[in-house]
């Protein structure tokens, strides 16, 4: 059995292509089932987000499994198989495990260390699990990846530092006020940057936000979309008298907020702090305003310095997380190798305990007058002999899990003890066939 991961992401395809190979949420369950019907696929999980579509699969043979996954993607989105090959990357074995761990922990994201992907990966796994397309290996591996990502984020704080301008703007406001929940904010501009700023403000806990825009209808649309208030640009001077935070992103020809405007309202505000954050180029806020008492004015250069510093912090955290991945891969491999050992140990124990049971039956026939107490003592001691005899062979069997020739040596081990253990590969195939029948039956029942 082999682990194959095929990924179409921001490194392998531009956004025009990525838009065409994204599964709708309501189509993902059926997509899991369709891929799972392929004989070469033993387990599968499909991850589909705005920046990546990925198929993770346990396959019987790498070449065949890879082809069927690529064919599945091509048929799903109306491409040729060669097109999918050109826009995707293929990872196999340890490389596939590393890729899964990097993606889940945010190391492969456009925004380094972002946490949204962790939730998306968890949802993808749960959907596959509920659909019935995961088995022993993926049920273990995906839980391991999710646990690893959670631990990595909590131990390194990789996602705590802002690396986008709009998010950094809110972080600057926090540096002045601390908690922002009780504050009032004004966002000037109803474009993309204005909406991003609004979302980051709402995400920080602020609920009292006013959208201000030259075109009132645009402000109204954005405000109603996010359940906040709105006003015209002419209302800005009066809003400045009571607001705490202003984020401006209009790129107007003239300054939206001038020195004279702020001087006028500062007399009304007295000692209340006002944070002005200008993320527009050219600037919306006249330079020099921060010379006025309790007025804090930041422009894009200030934000860039913060973003650059935070990005360096994230990169250091990412290096720490990446350094832990080899250990996780080793842990996974040890677990996988034990899958072949456990049935052998189980078969050895079963044979030994059968011998013990047969011995006790023989004793019962030859010594029928034994008391129940005497029988229990004999049974206990024969089991003890069995366990002591098995101790070293079982230890040797477990050590074979890390041996490069483990399959050959486990076969020899079975021959020596005349046992026949269940083949995990055959077990996986049988489990897959059983789950596939259940999925098919569910489809037929749902259709009827």
From Swiss-Prot:
The active site is at 50 (nucleophile). It comes from the Bacteria. Keywords: NADP, Oxidoreductase, Porphyrin biosynthesis. Pathway: Porphyrin-containing compound metabolism; protoporphyrin-IX biosynthesis; 5-aminolevulinate from L-glutamyl-tRNA(Glu): step 1/2. Its EC number is 1.2.1.70. Homodimer. Catalyzes the NADPH-dependent reduction of glutamyl-tRNA(Glu) to glutamate 1-semialdehyde (GSA). This is Glutamyl-tRNA reductase. It comes from Staphylococcus epidermidis (strain ATCC 12228 / FDA PCI 1200).
